[in-house]
């Protein structure tokens, strides 16, 4: 029996759970079996690219973080979910840190394990030849 608060739109996506039957969550893009969680069912998180089991976390379900390049298990952190860090090469567990999530450092040449130090994340040092312990 379909829950009355969900309706036909939500029931088609397998959204018959009690914790998912709310007006802000009853949308086809959000109400799915992998996204029917109270922490994920918010209007800002009801997007196809964000409603996945790896991304349904309170820290990742925000308008600025609901993107495929950021919403991953290794990058769903408050310090990484900023507009300046929204790049595929920056959303990795090795350099998802506040010191590296900045426009001048969000590049493949700088954001590496050997070059994500505060003193190294500057435009003059973000170069392949400089990404070493002796230089940075």
UniProtKB/Swiss-Prot annotation:
Q: Could you name the domain of life of the organism this protein comes from?
A: Eukaryota
Alphabetically list the UniProt keywords. Answer: Keratin, Repeat
* Name used for this protein in its record: Keratin-associated protein 4-2
Q: What GO molecular-function term can you cite, just one?
A: identical protein binding
What PANTHER family does the annotation carry? Answer: KERATIN ASSOCIATED PROTEIN, KERATIN-ASSOCIATED PROTEIN 4-6
The cross-references to InterPro entries, in alphabetical order and at most eight, read: KAP (IPR002494)
Positions of sequence repeats: 5-9, 20-24, 25-29, 30-34, 35-39, 40-44, 45-49, 50-54, 55-59, 60-64, 65-69, 70-74, 75-79, 80-84, 90-94, 95-99, 100-104, 110-114, 120-124, 125-129
Give disulfide pairs as residue numbers: none
What the protein does comes down to: In the hair cortex, hair keratin intermediate filaments are embedded in an interfilamentous matrix, consisting of hair keratin-associated proteins (KRTAP), which are essential for the formation of a rigid and resistant hair shaft through their extensive disulfide bond cross-linking with abundant cysteine residues of hair keratins. The matrix proteins include the high-sulfur and high-glycine-tyrosine keratins.
Sequence segments annotated as region (20 X 5 AA repeats OF C-C-[GRQVS]-[SPT]-[VSTQ]): 5-129
Question: Which family does the entry's similarity section mention?
Answer: Belongs to the KRTAP type 4 family.
Q: Say yes or no: keyword Thylakoid present.
A: no
**Gene Ontology CC entries for this record:** cytosol; keratin filament
Tell me how this protein assembles.
Interacts with hair keratins.
């Amino acid at each position: 029996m379909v829950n009355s608060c969900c309706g036909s739109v939500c029931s088609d996506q397998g959204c018959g759970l009690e914790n998912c039957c709310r007006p802000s969550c009853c949308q086809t893009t959000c109400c799915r079996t992998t996204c029917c969680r109270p922490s994920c069912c918010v209007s800002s998180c009801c997007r196809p690219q964000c409603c996945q089991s790896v991304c349904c976390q309170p820290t990742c379900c925000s308008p600025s973080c609901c993107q495929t390049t950021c919403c991953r298990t290794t990058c769903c952190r408050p310090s990484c979910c900023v507009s300046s860090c929204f790049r595929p090469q920056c959303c990795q567990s090795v350099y998802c840190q506040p010191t590296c999530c900045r426009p001048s450092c969000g590049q493949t040449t700088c954001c590496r394990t050997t070059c994500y130090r505060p003193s190294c994340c500057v435009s003059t040092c973000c170069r392949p030849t400089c990404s070493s312990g002796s230089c940075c």
